[in-house]
Amino acid sequence: ITYTDCTESGQNLCLCEGSNVCGKGNKCILGSNGEENQCVTGEGTPKPQSHNDGDFEEIPEEYLQ
C-alpha cells in the first residue's frame, strides 16, 4: 500500500490530496470528520483513490524525491 503525503499547516493540519507533502518521514492521518487531518511521523492512513476498499493509487515518483 502506498500512502499519500500531505502539507503541514496551522495546528498540524494537512491536506491529504494532490502533490502536497507533509515532510520527509511524515504521513497524513485523516480526521474523523474529514477535516482535522494531522501530519505525523511514520505511516498514516492510506488515501483511497476510488470507492473500492483496498484500491489505492501510488504516489508518482517525482513526488517522492
From Swiss-Prot:
Family, similarity comment: Belongs to the protease inhibitor I14 (hirudin) family.
SUPFAM superfamilies registered for this protein in UniProt: Leech antihemostatic proteins
Signal peptide from the UniProt entry: none
Biased composition (Acidic residues): 55-65
Protein's name in the database: Hirudin-2B
Glycosylation (residues): 45
Record's keyword annotation contains Amino-acid biosynthesis: no
GO function terms (MF aspect): serine-type endopeptidase inhibitor activity
Disulfide bonds: 6-14, 16-28, 22-39
Region of interest: Disordered: 39-65
Location in the cell: Secreted
Keyword annotations from UniProtKB, A to Z: Disulfide bond, Glycoprotein, Protease inhibitor, Secreted, Serine protease inhibitor, Sulfation
